């Protein structure tokens, strides 16, 4: 028998160290390339606040700016949806009106915070360059201010006393009587108006003697005089009442929702429902349509995954 050849020894430790070194170098090079490709973001300067209240005010202002950006994005989304779906164009003015109210509240809050900072003599951050949709509101009437200043100067020159004069418009009793008399005489409640309309229809069809009025109790003498025609009158009144009733589908909501769960809109032509982590939430028409699209995509993806698993 021949001698066995010796197996060459392999130094596993050195080979592993080499592989780890090469892999580490490759990862470092990849990170450097990614950093070079990405644009360097400017570092925000660290602001030292003088007091706790100053920090709270600046944080509130930043939050208002972020909320305002969200409102502008929401308005843009509603406009795009109204262009895609013609039915949503009717509700667009109401949606924009709600967003305008929210922007006015944010503007008032931001102006009060900036005024507080100015009173504390604290430098305010640079204002945002977001365009404002609504026109500025002039709270001061210059003509009133100038006339008031002129009257104060005249009074100071005369007796060094300030006198204030107020002009009020009063309505006399004759004017009130004329306005009350100008109201229509036939303005009656809705229930009585409908009953009178039904009675006029009955008198036109059956005659004034045989047609009893609805809502009034008939005496025994009237019932004996009418005898056999009462059956026809009752059938006519029931048919008129049934035709007056509006036939419509039952409402989806027992109570009208206050606002949309996603965008916070309070007015919409049609309210919808959705789920958020198993909880039912109220959605406006635009958000509800978007939710239905996303739900349909997820359902199709689940079906594709299930069919591929079965075939495999």
Curated annotation (Swiss-Prot):
Region annotation Disordered: where it falls in the sequence: 1-45, 213-232
- Please give the superkingdom of this protein's source: Eukaryota
Q: Where is the composition biased (Low complexity)?
A: 29-45
Give an example GO biological process: positive regulation of transcription by RNA polymerase II
Cellular component annotations (GO), alphabetically ordered: nucleus
Q: Which Pfam families match?
A: GATA
Could you tell me which PROSITE patterns the record lists for this protein?
GATA_ZN_FINGER_2
* Stored InterPro entries: Znf_GATA, Znf_NHR/GATA
What keywords are assigned to this protein? Metal-binding, Zinc, Zinc-finger
GO terms for MF: DNA-binding transcription factor activity, RNA polymerase II-specific; RNA polymerase II cis-regulatory region sequence-specific DNA binding; zinc ion binding
ZnF GATA-type residues are 260-287
Identification of the protein by name? GATA zinc finger domain-containing protein 20
């Amino acid at each position: 028998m021949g001698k066995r050849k010796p197996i060459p020894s392999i130094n596993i430790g050195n080979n592993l160290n080499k592989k780890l070194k090469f892999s580490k170098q490759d990862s470092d090079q990849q990170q450097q390339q990614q950093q070079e490709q990405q644009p360097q973001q400017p570092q925000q300067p660290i602001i030292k606040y003088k007091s706790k209240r100053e920090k709270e005010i600046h944080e509130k202002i930043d939050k208002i700016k972020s909320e305002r950006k969200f409102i502008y994005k929401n308005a843009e989304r509603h406009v795009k949806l109204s262009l895609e779906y013609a039915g949503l164009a009717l509700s667009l003015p109401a949606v924009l009106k709600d967003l305008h109210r929210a922007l006015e509240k944010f503007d008032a809050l931001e102006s009060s915070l900036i005024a507080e900072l100015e009173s504390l003599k604290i430098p305010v951050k640079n204002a945002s360059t977001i365009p404002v949709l609504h026109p500025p509101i002039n709270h001061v009437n210059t003509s009133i201010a100038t006339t008031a200043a002129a009257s104060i100067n005249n009074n100071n020159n005369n007796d060094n006393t300030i006198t204030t004069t107020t002009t009020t418009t009063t309505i006399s009793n004759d004017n009130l009587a004329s306005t009350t008399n100008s109201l229509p005489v036939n303005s009656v409640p809705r229930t009585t108006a409908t009953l009178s309309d039904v009675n006029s229809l009955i008198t036109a069809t059956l005659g004034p003697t045989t047609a009893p009025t609805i809502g009034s109790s008939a005496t025994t003498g009237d019932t004996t005089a009418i005898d056999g025609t009462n059956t026809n009158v009752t059938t006519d009144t029931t048919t008129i009442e049934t035709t007056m009733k509006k036939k419509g589908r039952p409402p989806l909501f027992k109570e009208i929702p206050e606002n949309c769960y996603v965008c916070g809109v309070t007015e919409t032509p049609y309210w919808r429902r959705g789920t958020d982590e198993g909880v039912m939430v109220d959605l406006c028409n635009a958000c509800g349509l978007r939710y239905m699209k996303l739900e349909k995509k997820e359902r199709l993806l689940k079906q594709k995954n299930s069919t591929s698993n079965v075939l495999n």
